Amino acid sequence: MAKISVSRLTKMKQDNQKITCMTAYDASFAAIFDQAGIQVLLVGDSLGMVLQGHDSTLPVTVDDIRYHTAAVVSTAKSAFIIADLPFMSYSTPEMSYENAAILMRAGANMVKMEGGEWLTDSVKGLVERGIPVCGHLGLTPQSVNIFGGYKVQGREEEQADELLNDALLLQEAGIQLLVLECVPVSLADRITTALKIPVIGIGAGCETDGQILVMHDAFGVSAGFCPKFSKNFLLETGDIRQAVTLYIDQVESRQFPSAEHSFY
């Protein structure tokens, strides 16, 4: 299979084809996901919770992401690889340039940043320097202490309008993908329709251009809490490879996420 490019992902949006994404942190699972046909792998700062055992993503460092990105890239030959810029690693444009370069040298195809309008200067600078950027709006886990917990965002009209405006500003600044997390289905639909770039949802309903899950949630192996928006695909299949195939099939056929996995 040919290497997935951002232009291929954009074409999938234009053709109304669903994009399938999953987090990955090591070579073994990256190979399974890649061979199954997952188009995008995210080396997420979620590793702080599912691998390191923290109660948030805040302790994760750039070196953590660099290490796991290199592991994923070693076996994922077709999937498009996105690496998270972790908490406080992009507070200024200059910091974002330096830390994004580290992740790109590790093999990432794109870096992801959480935040709205305040990121536009950094996004422009990164793109000018040849580094593709994925945005992340809605529930941004690095801001959990501002939100007062992991809560659905955009239910109030004013905040919904602000999120839509942020998405448009980030697109204008140069992001080529957007992750939209834990927002009502109606808002996700508005943002997905308004943007030319692909929108990847997690807890955002089935109207986005694609879906992403934390792999530990998708296999039901997360310690403790399992989010409402997730589903244990391993429970239905009993086999990891079959579970990945089921996830792909249900995303492509719009069976997942269903109403029970969505917010209104």
UniProtKB/Swiss-Prot annotation:
<keyword id="KW-0808">Transferase</keyword>
<comment type="similarity">
    <text>Belongs to the PanB family.</text>
</comment>
<feature type="binding site">
    <location>
        <position position="112"/>
    </location>
    <ligand>
        <name>3-methyl-2-oxobutanoate</name>
    </ligand>
</feature>
<feature type="binding site">
    <location>
        <position position="84"/>
    </location>
    <ligand>
        <name>3-methyl-2-oxobutanoate</name>
    </ligand>
</feature>
<keyword id="KW-0566">Pantothenate biosynthesis</keyword>
<protein>
    <recommendedName>
        <fullName>3-methyl-2-oxobutanoate hydroxymethyltransferase</fullName>
        <ecNumber>2.1.2.11</ecNumber>
    </recommendedName>
</protein>
<comment type="pathway">
    <text>Cofactor biosynthesis; (R)-pantothenate biosynthesis; (R)-pantoate from 3-methyl-2-oxobutanoate: step 1/2.</text>
</comment>
<dbReference type="InterPro" id="IPR015813">
    <property type="entry name" value="Pyrv/PenolPyrv_kinase-like_dom"/>
</dbReference>
<keyword id="KW-0460">Magnesium</keyword>
<feature type="binding site">
    <location>
        <begin position="45"/>
        <end position="46"/>
    </location>
    <ligand>
        <name>3-methyl-2-oxobutanoate</name>
    </ligand>
</feature>
<feature type="binding site">
    <location>
        <position position="45"/>
    </location>
    <ligand>
        <name>Mg(2+)</name>
    </ligand>
</feature>
<feature type="active site" description="Proton acceptor">
    <location>
        <position position="181"/>
    </location>
</feature>
<dbReference type="GO" id="GO:0005737">
    <property type="term" value="C:cytoplasm"/>
</dbReference>
<dbReference type="InterPro" id="IPR040442">
    <property type="entry name" value="Pyrv_kinase-like_dom_sf"/>
</dbReference>
<keyword id="KW-0963">Cytoplasm</keyword>
<comment type="function">
    <text>Catalyzes the reversible reaction in which hydroxymethyl group from 5,10-methylenetetrahydrofolate is transferred onto alpha-ketoisovalerate to form ketopantoate.</text>
</comment>
<dbReference type="GO" id="GO:0003864">
    <property type="term" value="F:3-methyl-2-oxobutanoate hydroxymethyltransferase activity"/>
</dbReference>
<feature type="binding site">
    <location>
        <position position="114"/>
    </location>
    <ligand>
        <name>Mg(2+)</name>
    </ligand>
</feature>
<dbReference type="InterPro" id="IPR003700">
    <property type="entry name" value="Pantoate_hydroxy_MeTrfase"/>
</dbReference>
<dbReference type="GO" id="GO:0015940">
    <property type="term" value="P:pantothenate biosynthetic process"/>
</dbReference>
<comment type="subunit">
    <text>Homodecamer; pentamer of dimers.</text>
</comment>
<keyword id="KW-0479">Metal-binding</keyword>
<dbReference type="GO" id="GO:0000287">
    <property type="term" value="F:magnesium ion binding"/>
</dbReference>
<feature type="binding site">
    <location>
        <position position="84"/>
    </location>
    <ligand>
        <name>Mg(2+)</name>
    </ligand>
</feature>
<dbReference type="Pfam" id="PF02548">
    <property type="entry name" value="Pantoate_transf"/>
</dbReference>
